[in-house]
Amino acid sequence: MPLEMDQKVNKLTFGCQRSSTSDDDSGCAMEEYTWVPPGLRLEQVQLYFACLPEEKIPYVNSVGEKYRIKQLLYQLPPHDNEVRYCQSLSEEEKKELQMFSAQRKKEALGRGNIKMLSRAVMHATCEKCGEKINGGEVAIFVSRAGPGVCWHPSCFVCSTCNELLVDLIYFYQDGKIHCGRHHAELLKPRCSACDEIIFADECTEAEGRHWHMNHFCCYECETVLGGQRYIMKDGRPFCCGCFESHYAEYCESCGEHIGVDHAQMTYDGQHWHATETCFSCAQCKVSLLGCPFLPKKGRIYCCKACSLGEDVHASDSSDSAFQSARSRESRRSVRMGKSSRSADQCRQSLLLSPAVNYKFPGMFGNADDTLSRKMDDLSMSRQGAGFDNDTWKARDEQETAEDHEEWAEHDDYMTQLLLKFGEKGLFQQPPEDNRSNDHWMSENIKGKNDLQRNNRNQSLASKKYQSDMYWAQSQDGLGDSAYGSHPGPASSRKLQELDMDHGASGYMHEKMPWYKRSLECLSNNLKPQNENICDSMDSLALSNITGASVDAESKSRPSLFSYQNFQELNTRDFDKMSNMGTLNSSMLNRSTESLKSLNSEICQEKPPPEEKPMHTSALKRSKSQTRPQVKFSDDVIDNGDYSSIEIRRPPMSERSRRRVYNSEEQSQRPHHHHHHRRRKSRKSRSENALHLATDSKSSGKERKRSYTAEDYERLFHNKSAHEVQAYIQNADLFGQYSNAASNVGLPSQVVDKFLGLYGEDEDSWCSTCSSSSSDSEEEGYFLGQPIPKPRPQRYQYFSDDLCSPTNALSSSQFSQRTSKSKKKKGHKGKNCIIS
């Protein structure tokens, strides 16, 4: 035999000897492996290990060797089989452990057999993966599963942990193979603390695992947690104290520990207390609990503006005190169809333009418009009775010491207006030569002060109107209760001064005849008189702010207008103002007579006495005007007793018919000289401005008297020079009346027809005593012209001083308004209230 052949045989023989198995359980027949499957030849061993991952092959001094040792301890724990490895078993438990181990070995323990499939085998399938095992390949068979069941070497794993069964040792249970650990757990619970099988009757179960009763304790301090609060961390129980000291998070907002008793918010590794204070916007501190947020540079924000560092609460408005109220009113204005012009734009454009009339931006005080000025003063009238100047003079002396520019030092817009146009600006009489320097207050306002100073009985509404007329309009005409609780300083002063004026005596006039006055006073006083045409609008807004009704019984309200601006107002301005003031405020505030007529069966008012003194307190007269839905702050509240009066707001279906209802009621009841007499409703106030009529006030005991020139001379003959001073500011109203009446020359029949649109009964409107007169109705002559008698059942309009009908409108303009007024009889025009 050749030498080479001998070497090959010797090599093969040597290899077979190394591959032979020994009788011990080591299974390490080959030197290069720490363990080899028993009973296999070398080529079969090499084929088997070739099917396993390289890191799991148990080479000597390799990673596979360490892996095998680890798996032996894990899959085949010694304390599951041997009592000597257990720590704290009772005698009974030890016996039970021995029985348990013997039963498992007998019923489930086995070792897999490695076989090379014959090439004739064509249909072998892996039990794990279900793939086909071809002939000539190595497969593992399990005797407890049956002869035909086999696995790939890499698929022979525990059904629970999917780890390779170490040394091919398995436990068969219910058609599946398991490692020793998980097979034992199928039969008995294992303690998560000591890793031993629990043979006791009681155990603790938590988080899906089990413990011996005395083994369920804190992982750090070993405090028994049975029945106590605990926190699981990485599969280990901790008491609350140990958990907070080792694992508690810090709040990103306050920097404190987030205790186990506090809920926390976690985002991107950051933690916050789940409170409105901590989990809030880093800029504006708005709570973000339950809200989306914007994370930026480790901080959270509520919006993009805050993340950029902007102050979302900053206001660029000059009256930030009314921001919330204006927002409520703006939402209301969308429904009411109000002008979309902002309040800031309105105030800035009006205050910074002295030539523009504040109340009506569309009306300008043009000095060249002589016809407009004459028409304005023809509508303007005065009354011969009013307050004494002593009360106002004492108050003016106290306030003149105030700095003239004090209003400019205040940032708040309302404070500026009240300082500039309050009592100081409205009631103080500056010298004639200084009028040209007062650009902030029009001379029309000063004329209005003279007119209101002549009232014999100042009421709550009239006193508040004097100091607050800019206050009402500065809210952009908002005639709603959004500002009803504004505690303005001017309004509080007026309420405190109510009872100071009710006993004042009337004016005495100079003996100088009215027709001897120069025309210079006329030019000084005629400047912007046209603004008062919108007083009915402002009174509606003001009544909601101050809570007092500003009606014809409360103060003199002359409606001044210019002939050229009337059509512009009729087509444009009143469409805006009526929606804004009249419609809104009329629904909120009802006149006394309307409430009485609509609620005659429900609200029984105590009838006032037949004759009231001329100095009756304004608060007593305003009791019927009190509306419970308007709320006031403490500094403007009147502590009078109003509990005896019950007022119910009528339903909407009754509101639009209140004048017709009143007309029927007035026609049925006798005409008494009531002090609490019928008032003009807010609706008539709006139409008064629309129809170019003035709220002329007659004196308390006179009604439809006619006067001649001799009567006026006798009137002024009895007046003192000091008390006629009020008429100086208005420059010969009587002369204006005479001239304009003769120049314009309106037909008296048209006047009666126009004035008749407003009358439902024979009661006239009185500004002072508020009583209807039944004195003589004889015919008279005014400057040689006969005064026509009015039709019955109609109101007659009188000037404040002359107490004679005002016939001061052009016939063309008047006939145009008369035709429009006929269509609007019943108050269904576009500027009327539509419920």
UniProtKB/Swiss-Prot annotation:
Residues 432-453, 603-614, 646-655 have a biased composition (Basic and acidic residues). SUPFAM superfamilies: Glucocorticoid receptor-like (DNA-binding domain) (SSF57716). Residues 14-122 form the PET domain. Residues 124-188, 189-249, 250-313 form the LIM zinc-binding domain. One of its GO terms (biological process) is convergent extension involved in gastrulation. One of its GO terms (molecular function) is zinc ion binding. Residues 669-683, 819-835 have a biased composition (Basic residues). It holds the Pfam family LIM. A lipid is attached at C832 (S-farnesyl cysteine). InterPro entries: LIM2_prickle, LIM3_prickle, PET_domain, PET_prickle, Pk/Esn/Tes, Znf_LIM. Expressed in the dorsal marginal zone of early gastrulae (stage 10). As gastrulation proceeds, expression expands to include the lateral and ventral marginal zones, excluding the few rows of cells above the blastopore lip. Expression moves dorsally with gastrulation cell movements, and by the end of gastrulation expression is seen in dorsal mesoderm and posterior but not anterior neural ectoderm. Expression becomes down-regulated in mesoderm but remains strong in posterior ectoderm through the neurula stages. Acts in a planar cell polarity (PCP) complex; polarization along the apical/basal axis of epithelial cells. Regulates the polarized assembly of fibronectrin on the surface of the mesoderm during gastrulation. Essential for gastrulation cell movements, cooperating with dvl2/dsh to activate jnk. Acts together with tes to control axial elongation. This is Prickle-like protein 1-A. It comes from Xenopus laevis (African clawed frog). The lineage of its organism: Eukaryota, Metazoa, Chordata, Craniata, Vertebrata. The gene is prickle1-a.
